[in-house]
Design a protein with these regions (language model features):
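Amphipathic, Lys/Arg-enriched alpha-helical "gate/interface" segment within cytosolic domains
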Residues: 1-130
Length: 130
């Protein structure tokens, strides 16, 4: 499975990890996690450290994903940390961050990091992701 996720209810955190080749269709499919009421308002860490290849999405698809995500946001603010140690995923993450920030419906603050440790520090999580 290219994107695995785990829900940590104690920390109110969704931990997602990409593997292998990642496509935009898989990322859109992953958004179904956010339609689950029990994770409304949770923070999220999306780790792309193990992604070997990305089928580059168009700018329009990144905008569509950001709009879909913003429309699914809970009323309470939350945060999304994207971990992208390599340049292409980092750039795509920054594009997504920008589009999310431009959507007035968005209640989720997005930030992109090169390391899991920096992402966890920003999220305020004390434990590492295993």
């Amino acid at each position: 499975m290219p994107i695995e996720h785990e829900i940590d209810h104690r920390r109110r955190l969704v931990l997602a990890k990409g593997h292998g080749t990642l496509t935009d269709a898989e990322v859109f499919h992953y958004q179904r996690v956010w339609s689950r009421p029990e994770v409304a308002g949770y923070d999220e860490l999306f780790d792309m450290s193990d992604v070997a290849d990305i089928t580059p999405p168009s700018t329009e698809r990144i905008r569509e994903l950001a709009q879909l995500s913003a429309a699914m946001d809970a009323l309470s603010p939350s945060r999304l940390a994207i971990v992208a140690p390599n340049d292409l995923p980092f750039a795509l993450g920054r594009m997504y961050e920008t589009h999310r920030g431009l959507d007035k419906r968005s209640t989720k603050t997005v930030n992109v990091f090169r390391s899991v440790e920096d992402a966890l520090a920003w999220l305020g999580s004390e434990r590492s992701v295993t």
